[in-house]
Amino acid sequence: MAVLIRRLEEPDQVDLFDCGDEPLNNYLRRHAWANQQKSSIGVTYVAIEEGAPRTVLGYFTLATASVPRDSFPKKYVRGLPPYDLPLILLARLAVDRRFSGKGLGHALISEAFNVALRVADDVGCRGIIADAYRGRVEWYSRYGFVALEGGAPTGPERMFLDMRTIRMALKQP
């Protein structure tokens, strides 16, 4: 299966997408396009099969964010000015259940890293944050994300990945 990852387009078929998590399904179906085109508060990228170029297999959404410097472990902010850190928020990431276990999650997060590097080079940002569901913390950790202190005890875990780690992993200067 040849997969292409690109920005969400209005004619993309999102109604049948089902990752097993209704808030993630609803976001893609009801909000992703408007947030991208009308509100400019996030951009959604979709994985599609080249043979079925409108069927969404998975997606991620990126937005800008800033977080107070004191939310980070000292090793990540040593030597930085006392400002909030500019970041990219990995706001959503989901794979349709029909395509789970085929490496799409890896492909999606890898593309998110590539987009983040381009943004960092163009406007500057320190890293990526994600609010990982409790059952997905280990998955994000495998990519180098670390938990930030002060997260909600019952909600998602706020996690951080330094842009330098992404550069090293992708072997970019």
Range-by-range predicted roles:
Residues A130, Y140-S141, F145:
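Conserved active-site tyrosine of GNAT-family acetyltransferases
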Residues S40-T64, S71:
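Conserved beta-hairpin
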Residues G101-V115:
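Conserved acetyl-CoA-binding loop-helix of GNAT-fold acetyltransferases
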Residues Y59-R92, S100:
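Conserved acyl-donor/pantetheine-binding loop and adjacent beta-alpha core of acyl/acetyltransferases
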Residues M1-K38:
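Short amphipathic alpha-helix that is part of the acyltransferase structural core
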Residues G124-G135, E149-P173:
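C-terminal "cap" of GNAT-fold acetyltransferases
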Residues G42, L85, C125-G127:
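Short coil/loop residues immediately preceding or within conserved phosphate-binding loops
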Residues N35-K38, L117-V123:
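Alpha-helix termini
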